[in-house]
């Protein structure tokens, strides 16, 4: 089992290059199933979820490889298999995105449900209902979602009941080859959806309105190849900005896009950070000061992102003053708080709200990561705590942060990865 050992009391300063967004790369990789010609993608991060996606695509018959510059090449012209198997899907819920392009182009597709994933309790039902509205017949058998269509998907007006990034992407991807016009209402507006639409349009799709709550897709007969660069990762950017803010440091995030982070930047300014932005950089300077507490309420984009909630929970635990954090997007997303309390943080949880009371310092401890964003907050806590922090289950971090310890060390953090030997 791999773990991180972090030695604390580091002030994080310097420059960091932001990677491509995993949340754009994943749907774009699956959307490449639609292409009848080769596709080249640049700025694709090296992450476990990306590797899993490439393995799923290879299982379907897509030829994939990374060149010496790190670009990912895909050729889906000879897909001969239509099942995304459990042994790959079980580690990544985003695998459901394989279903839409398969049924759209090949009239059939099967994707295993991830372990423990009940359709009624997960947003997977929104993916399925969207495809059904386009004419797909879907059954759940033997742990697989099986979809097929007689003839062709047919464009429809689809109102998504609850704003969902995943469902918006599934419907948009499927509708590119549907007959007629599809209109998605109450669509999610995230930049990763816009990036996926840009990619699809480069291949010959006719999509308008991505980035707004109404997306229109005019179906086309086929999609060709293209080259595309993945949009920068706004959540990684926000994470490094918080890292500097909680440590009193100064950071320049390069290869990023400030316009996708307005809500986060506003809150960091409220916390006392001096921030300057250019077209592709963000500079944050805390000038050695402790942050001020800020209230947070997560909302769909362009509101405050749920994927930054854990990082700001940490910020509030070491800030001056008290704060209220309300999580409106996901349930059970405060699992990092008990671990931060073990490090000396002060907070109470009432339903979907956490009340944080800032302390001057945290103390190193052995803590356990529970999910991607919670785990990075524990690593950052270790960077500023007194003493040594051990973070367990860091495979969560490897799913979403490229070369994280290398980047943190470049900013002055004392962090190392090690493998703990299991004794019988």
From Swiss-Prot:
Top enzyme class, one word, equals transferase
Q: Which reaction does it catalyse?
A: phosphoenolpyruvate + UDP-N-acetyl-alpha-D-glucosamine = UDP-N-acetyl-3-O-(1-carboxyvinyl)-alpha-D-glucosamine + phosphate
A molecular-function term among this protein's GO annotations: UDP-N-acetylglucosamine 1-carboxyvinyltransferase activity
Q: Which Gene3D superfamilies match?
A: Enolpyruvate transferase domain
Q: Which residues carry this modification: 2-(S-cysteinyl)pyruvic acid O-phosphothioketal?
A: 117
Its pathway is:
Cell wall biogenesis; peptidoglycan biosynthesis
GO biological process terms, semicolon-separated:
cell division; cell wall organization; peptidoglycan biosynthetic process; regulation of cell shape; UDP-N-acetylgalactosamine biosynthetic process
This protein's GO cellular component annotations are:
cytoplasm
The residues annotated as the active site are 117 (proton donor)
| EC number(s) recorded for this UniProt protein | 2.5.1.7
Q: Which InterPro entries match?
A: Enolpyruvate_Tfrase_dom, Enolpyruvate_Tfrase_sf, MurA_subfamily, RNA3'P_cycl/enolpyr_Trfase_a/b, UDP_GlcNAc_COvinyl_MurA
List the subcellular locations. Answer: Cytoplasm
Keyword tags: Cell cycle, Cell division, Cell shape, Cell wall biogenesis/degradation, Cytoplasm, Peptidoglycan synthesis, Pyruvate, Transferase
Broad class of where this protein is predominantly found: cytoplasm
CDD domains per UniProt: UdpNAET
Q: Which residues bind phosphoenolpyruvate?
A: 22-23
- Write out the residues that bind UDP-N-acetyl-alpha-D-glucosamine: 93, 122-126, 162-165, 307, 329
Instruction: Give the matching Pfam families.
Output: EPSP_synthase
Q: Which family does it belong to?
A: Belongs to the EPSP synthase family. MurA subfamily.
Its annotated function is as follows: Cell wall formation. Adds enolpyruvyl to UDP-N-acetylglucosamine.
Matches recorded under NCBIfam families: murA, PRK09369.1
Q: What is this protein called?
A: UDP-N-acetylglucosamine 1-carboxyvinyltransferase
Please name the source species: Histophilus somni (strain 129Pt) (Haemophilus somnus)
State which gene encodes it: murA
